[in-house]
Amino acid sequence: MIPKEEVERPQKKTKLPSLPCETSLFLQLPDEILVNCLARLSKSSYRSLSLVCKTFRSLLHSQPLYSARYQLGTTEICCLYLCLRFVTATEPVSRWFTLSRRSGSVLVPSDHSLPYSNSTVTMGSKIYGEHMGDAFGPSSAIWIYDCFTRSWGDVPNMKMKRENASACVLDDKIYVMGGCDSGGINWFEMFDVKTQCWRPLPANPDVKVMTEDNVRKIDVVGGKIYVKTGAEFMDWIYDVKRGKWSAADEYMSLLWSNSWCVIENVMYCYSCSRYRWYDLEARMWREVKGLKYLKRYSSASNDNRNRMVELVNFGGKLAILWDRFERPGRSENKNIWCAMVALNRDFEGEIWGTVEWLNVVLTVPKSYNFLRPIAVSV
């Protein structure tokens, strides 16, 4: 007779925790309503929600959710991509780094192997850029990377092969100019994201501007494309609605540097060691108040001619990037600094900047080149 203590007792089955009644009822709603509800929540809650059930996990990584956030205006600028080029024994190597809320105030190598392109632009969660041909030759192909779904795509080729073109975005349309032969009828063209078609636009009146690399940067202010060219050329403005070119004001060009960006239809630039904004009504540059504090961190460089300063629209805030040698005197490395500035206009019309934080975000060899910053919303 087997002793009672040796008899195996049947093990009780462990019950999986059931979903709360409220959650079960919530999941009975159509996906369209679920997506609309999730789109109104902060992305900071998405990680916890993804643990609730498979349905949430699937919806939280879907394109319809991003589209709903975009339409509701609840997308968040949460990542700054920087492309840097480093000298190696064989050939220069371009690498992307990211500065996000998750990484804090430190640049980390990007998880995405994005190609470098001077014409890289963002539209929502998608990054668009031109494919570089063999040996960095001209190309008409365009790649897309969706940071929300982490997927790649393509669009129809441009009508003109380009190299180091300039691009900007206005009303779901991508405008590309330059980087090609000045004799081409498609020197300036527009891509409509909705119709997936390219259309040629009127070329710049100045043939010299249309030669390679004479367009430094373009961006949009009040429905017009502002074109910054080389120092020896005239700057231009293209009125999108009228399809007309006009020369930029001489005083505007006088202090308009290559370090500039547009935030809420206001142009900001860094020139003559000051941060400025352009008053369209008064047709003059004004200084952004409250940023003299930054001079102590940026003016100590002993190589001002080669010092980098970049301005980026980071979700309505001004992200300022600059470099300086790691130590005074001889140094083989440079520190890349970043300052995040909140902007406010006072009753007298002056714009004030408040530095929310600043820090060294990366240390790099002094031989590096800063190529491109872009901000992405997800």
Curated annotation (Swiss-Prot):
Repeat as UniProt keyword: yes
PANTHER family, per database record: F-BOX DOMAIN-CONTAINING PROTEIN, F-BOX/KELCH-REPEAT PROTEIN SKIP4
Keywords: Kelch repeat, Repeat
Pfam families: F-box, Kelch_FKB95
Name this protein carries in UniProt: F-box/kelch-repeat protein At4g29370
Organism: Arabidopsis thaliana (Mouse-ear cress)
Keyword Repeat: yes
Ranges for the Kelch repeats: 124-172, 173-218, 220-259, 260-305
